[in-house]
Amino acid sequence: MTRPLVGVLALQGDVREHLAALNDSGADAVGIRRPEELEKIDGLVIPGGESTTMSKLLQIFELLEPLKARLRDGLPAYGSCAGMILLASEILDTRPDAQHLGAIDMTVRRNAFGRQVDSFESDLEFEGIVGDPMRAVFIRAPWVERVGDDVQVLARVPESGGAAAGRIVAVRQGAVVATSFHPEVTGDRRVHELFVDIVRGV
């Protein structure tokens, strides 16, 4: 599999930025809006946006159950920000009717870093990614409050991060990866390259 076909859930969020990042990282990338399109892809990116709105759109576009089924069957997936929330098995501070995919055994707190004005950037050490620390952009971002035994913690907010110091902001379980931050907006392709490598290896 030289250039795997990776879909980007194209309902909301930084779709174009993820498509560009995937193309730069050695994948052929395509927007996904219909259930039948899920069958053709080797991996899926779930972009940021507003998680409760995205969960409604998944139901409206009849993607929720087909996507859950593909994830159960081992489809590699990567979620950033709201995508992380949707991939979680448990979500705190969300609407009672919000749907999620349950692909990673973790508890996530929505908007944990605060409102838009509380958005910030930080340099992170990221497990499995070599080179300089990764510049991470957090926009009304979640953090992870609990992970299951099979979940690998990939990054935490550094000690210089104030009240958020030590909080988990990147995880992996099997072929599913999630980050609180938005690597698609910085030009640093290393998270997307890691995910494309995971897709190739499945």
UniProtKB/Swiss-Prot annotation:
Function: Catalyzes the hydrolysis of glutamine to glutamate and ammonia as part of the biosynthesis of pyridoxal 5'-phosphate. The resulting ammonia molecule is channeled to the active site of PdxS.
MF terms in GO: glutaminase activity; pyridoxal 5'-phosphate synthase (glutamine hydrolysing) activity
GO terms for cellular component: cytosol; glutaminase complex
Protein name: Pyridoxal 5'-phosphate synthase subunit PdxT
Active site as annotated: C81, H182, E184
UniProt EC number: 4.3.3.6, 3.5.1.2
Hydrolase as UniProt keyword: yes
Description of how the protein assembles with itself and partners: In the presence of PdxS, forms a dodecamer of heterodimers. Only shows activity in the heterodimer.
Family: Belongs to the glutaminase PdxT/SNO family.
PANTHER family to which the protein is assigned, alphabetical: PYRIDOXAL 5'-PHOSPHATE SYNTHASE SUBUNIT SNO, PYRIDOXAL 5'-PHOSPHATE SYNTHASE SUBUNIT SNO1-RELATED
A Pfam entry, by short name: SNO
Binding of L-glutamine, residues: G49, E50, S51, R110, I139, R140
Xref: InterPro entries: Class_I_gatase-like, PdxT/SNO, PdxT/SNO_CS
Gene3D superfamilies for the chain: 3.40.50.880
Disulfide bond residue pairs: none
Pathway, per record: Cofactor biosynthesis; pyridoxal 5'-phosphate biosynthesis
Lyase listed as a keyword: yes
Highest taxon of the lineage: Bacteria
Reaction equations catalysed: aldehydo-D-ribose 5-phosphate + D-glyceraldehyde 3-phosphate + L-glutamine = pyridoxal 5'-phosphate + L-glutamate + phosphate + 3 H2O + H(+); L-glutamine + H2O = L-glutamate + NH4(+)
Swiss-Prot/TrEMBL keywords: Glutamine amidotransferase, Hydrolase, Lyase, Pyridoxal phosphate
Protein's GO biological process: glutamine catabolic process; pyridoxal phosphate biosynthetic process; pyridoxine metabolic process
